[in-house]
């Protein structure tokens, strides 16, 4: 434990030097052993909200309330700022099946596809279902459309740093914020622990070894299996994947990005049978849009937490 405390101090210092704060947690899904940095700090979730959205939609498909083959006409996103993907950048309407909207929303992180799903299952209903499954620290208040109405969309790309400077400077000690999407009282929110709990419930059905004393929240197996597939197909692999994916390990995840927020949550399954849930939610104190160093630092901190758990 003393060695772990020394490691945590070292990692906190590295995050401070890199201009990052955040909520980190890594958990061994067989033993329940975990190691983290401020894992209960509440932060806006950005695109991580697409995980509970997908799970709620998949459950409604299972119950027969929603037809996965139903064709939905989706208006073009017409977004021109850097970042958004898929239908969000379309110039013309498209007809897409609900099942395919789930792929676009979860694996491609397409906000317009997510909003089409939120039209079917509104935020309040998604949150109600999340609560019924026992996840008390995941809050769903709004659709993705509101995430495209931040200061970042009001500046030219050359002035993106001004939006980040506002994001950094306009918060309060209680995590209120002048930008509503960054205000924990108004935004979709969660913690690293809440997302690790969700990941553990999603992966529990495929953990084949003994789990002494471990119980997970019960999720319907069919939606959980499909969401694992969608996370395995995640196309955005620039953040934690370089430190977790290899020929001897598979990495399934979802990213989230908004202004100075950079998040990723996922599960790494090692060829030797070990399985770890990883959640990283961060805020940057550096007013810059492109920060590859921050992405690398997030991954390094998470990997070292995982490495320490593998030694236990």
From Swiss-Prot:
Keywords: Transcription, Transcription regulation. GO terms for biological process: beta-lactam antibiotic catabolic process; response to antibiotic. One of its GO terms (molecular function) is beta-lactamase activity. Disulfide bonds: none annotated. It holds the Pfam family Beta-lactamase2. InterPro entries: Beta-lactam/transpept-like, Beta-lactam_cat, Beta-lactam_class-A. This is Beta-lactamase regulatory protein BlaB.
């Amino acid at each position: 434990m003393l060695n772990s405390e020394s490691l945590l101090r070292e990692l906190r210092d590295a995050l401070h030097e890199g201009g990052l704060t955040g909520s980190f947690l890594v958990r061994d899904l067989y033993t329940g052993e975990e190691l983290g940095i401020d894992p209960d700090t509440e932060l806006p979730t950005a695109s991580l909200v697409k995980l509970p959205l997908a799970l709620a939609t998949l459950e409604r498909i299972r119950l027969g309330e929603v037809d996965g083959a139903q064709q939905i006409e989706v208006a073009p996103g017409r977004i021109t700022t850097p970042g958004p993907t898929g239908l969000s950048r379309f110039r013309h309407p498209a007809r897409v099946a609900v099942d395919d909207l789930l792929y676009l929303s979860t694996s491609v992180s397409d906000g317009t596809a997510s909003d089409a799903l939120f039209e079917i299952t509104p935020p309040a209903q998604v949150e109600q279902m999340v609560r019924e499954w026992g996840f008390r620290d995941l809050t769903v208040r709004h659709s993705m459309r509101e995430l495209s109405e931040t200061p970042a969309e009001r500046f030219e790309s050359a002035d993106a740093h001004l939006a980040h400077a506002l994001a950094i400077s306009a918060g309060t000690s209680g995590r209120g914020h002048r930008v509503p999407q960054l205000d924990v009282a108004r935004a979709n929110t969660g913690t690293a622990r809440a997302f690790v709990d969700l990941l553990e419930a999603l992966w529990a059905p495929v953990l084949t070894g003994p789990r002494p004393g471990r119980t997970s929240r019960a999720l319907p197996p069919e939606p959980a299996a499909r969401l694992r597939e969608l996370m395995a197909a995640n196309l955005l692999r620039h953040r934690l994947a370089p430190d977790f994916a290899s020929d001897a390990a598979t990495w399934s995840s979802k990213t989230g990005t908004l202004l100075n927020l950079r998040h990723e949550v996922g599960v790494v399954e090692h060829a030797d049978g070990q399985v770890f849930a990883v959640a990283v939610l961060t805020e940057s104190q550096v007013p810059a849009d492109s920060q590859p160093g921050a992405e690398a630092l997030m991954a390094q901190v998470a990997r070292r937490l995982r490495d320490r758990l593998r030694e236990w």
